[in-house]
């Protein structure tokens, strides 16, 4: 029973999203602009991502949405 309670608390915490961040993403259009260095190679990025340039590009395991929702670009690019 205790594990079930912990599971539901974690699920609710993961589903809670800052509405302001969603609005920022919606107004931005959800596209990612790559810098010249981003096109050449993908480097390790860390949370928090402030702008689209801080977020990993399409060749990385973390996505723009992951960054904008506050979960961070912490994985090594693939």
Swiss-Prot record:
Disulfide-bond pairs as recorded: 42-56, 49-60, 55-77, 67-73
Function text: Probable ion channel inhibitor.
Family stated for the protein in its record: Belongs to the neurotoxin 13 (insecticidal toxin ABC) family. 03 (JZTX-59) subfamily.
Tissue: Expressed by the venom gland.
Signal peptide location: 1-19
Keyword check for Secreted: yes
Record's comment describing the protein's domains: The presence of a 'disulfide through disulfide knot' structurally defines this protein as a knottin.
Keyword Transmembrane annotated: no
InterPro entries for this protein: Spider_insecticidal_peptide
Keyword terms, alphabetized: Disulfide bond, Ion channel impairing toxin, Knottin, Secreted, Signal, Toxin
GO cellular component: extracellular region
One Pfam family matching this protein: Toxin_21
Subcellular localization, as worded in the UniProt entry: Secreted
The organism of origin for this protein: Chilobrachys guangxiensis
Protein name: U29-theraphotoxin-Cg1a
Recorded GO MF terms: ion channel regulator activity; toxin activity
């Amino acid at each position: 029973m205790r594990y079930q309670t912990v599971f539901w608390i974690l699920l609710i915490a993961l589903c809670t999203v800052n509405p302001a961040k969603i609005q920022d993403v919606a107004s931005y259009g959800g596209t990612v602009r790559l810098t010249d260095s981003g096109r050449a190679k993908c480097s390790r990025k860390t949370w928090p991502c402030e702008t689209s340039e801080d977020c990993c590009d399409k060749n990385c395991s973390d996505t723009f949405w992951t960054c904008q929702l506050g979960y961070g670009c912490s994985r090594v690019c693939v």
